[in-house]
Amino acid sequence: MRPISRALSALILLAPLTTLAQTYTPKAIRINAPSTVDTAEALRIAALPANSPLTKQQIETALQRLADTGLFADVGYTVNSDALVIKLTPSASSQLQPAHFANFVWWQPADLESLLEAAVPGYHGQLPLAGTLTDQVKAALVSLLHTKGVDATVDAHENGFAADSVTLSIVSPSIVIGDLQLQNSLPALLPQLKTLQHRLQGQDFDVAETSRAVQESVNDLYRNAGYLDVNTSAPTHSAPRKDLLTYAVDLTSTVTPGDVYHVSSLQLHAQPPVSEADLAKAANIKPGDIASPAAQRLATSEMKLAYANQGYFDAKVLFTVHQNSTSHTIDYTCDFVPGDVYHFASIDTSALALDQQAAFARAFTVAPGIVADAHLLAAIQQALQSLKLGFPVRLGMVPDPSTHTVKIVLKTSASPAH
C-alpha cells in the first residue's frame, strides 16, 4: 500500500472530523485538481457514497485508494458546510510510461485499450512506475482472457518493448508464431524463405518484436539478392488457434521486391603496403555483379585480412555506397586507413606436450620483433608440419594495441598424449 502523503495528513488535521466515530454528510463531493485529471474517474476510484454520512476512516480509505494508484503525487481533503473537497496533484509525466501489449492476439489494439479504459478507472494508455494501477490492469486482462476461455497468467515489466515503456504479456499459456505466409514471393528465394519460416515457427509471439523480426529477416534475404528497394509489409495475424498447450498465431506479409540492383563501379583508394590489384582480388566485386550487402560485408572482411596479412591488424575499410534508384545501379568507393604495423612478441606453445614444445622450439627459430605478417604465420605452420603431430593446431592471435605487438597462441582441439 502506498502511504498517504504528508500533504494529505496535514490537510486531514485541519478537518473537523477528529475521531473515527464522528460522521459528516457532505452536500457534495468535489475534486480540486488540474484540468488534466478526469474528475469523474477520480470519484469512481474514491468510491465514496453521495448524500450519505461519512466517517473519517471512510474518507481516509478513499484517499488511500487514490494514492495507491500511483497516478497522484499528493492527495488531500478539506471539509466545510458545503462540500467535501478532495485535492489531487498528478504524478509527474516522468513517472508515467506508455503500456505495450505484447501478445493479446484476441483483440485489436484499439479495442483492447477501450475495454481496459472501461474496466480500470484512471487507465488511459499509461502506467505509473509505482502504485496499484498496473496490477489492476493485469487483473482486468486476466478477466478479459477468461471471456475467451483462456486461463492465463499475465506479467508486466519495464522496458520490454522500448525504453520508458511497460510491457504486459501473457506468460502462460505460451503464444507462439505458427505459419508465416509471404505473398508475392520470388521463386528463386523460396528455399531461403522456407528456412526462415521454419526458424520463426514456434518462437514467442510479440506484436512489435515479431513484426520487426519478420520484416527485417525477409528484407535482408531480398537485399542480399540485389533487391535493395524491397518492402515487406507488417505481418497481419490470424485468430489464435490452440496447439496442444500453446496458442499459435499464423502470420501473413506481402513482399514488394522492386528491381534488382547491379554494381556499376568499384573504386579502391589503396594505401600501402597493399596494392589496388590485391585489394580488388580480395574484394571480388566486379561491375555487373548483383549489388549485395552480404557481398559487401565479405569484401570488407577480405580486404581487412589483406592488410592483416601485412601486419596491419587495426586497418579500417571504409565503404561509401552511391545508390542510383533510376538506373538501379550501385557505385562503391572504398577508402583505407591501415593504422600501425604490428610486430611479433612471443608464441605460447603450452597446448603441446613438453617434448613437442621442445621440438617446436628447435624447428621455429624466428626471433621476436619481426612484422607479424603472413610470412610469420607460414613459418609457424611449417614448423608445426615438421612435428607430424597427427592432430590439428590452430593459431590464435592476441594483439596488444598499446604496444602494437602480437602474441601467437597455439590451440588444439584434441589433448595430446603426454
Regions found by a protein language model. Give the residues of each.
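Interaction-mediating elements
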Residues: T23-H418
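Bacterial N-terminal signal peptides that target proteins for export
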Residues: M1-S9
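N-terminal signal peptide c-region/cleavage motif recognized by signal peptidases
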Residues: P16-T18
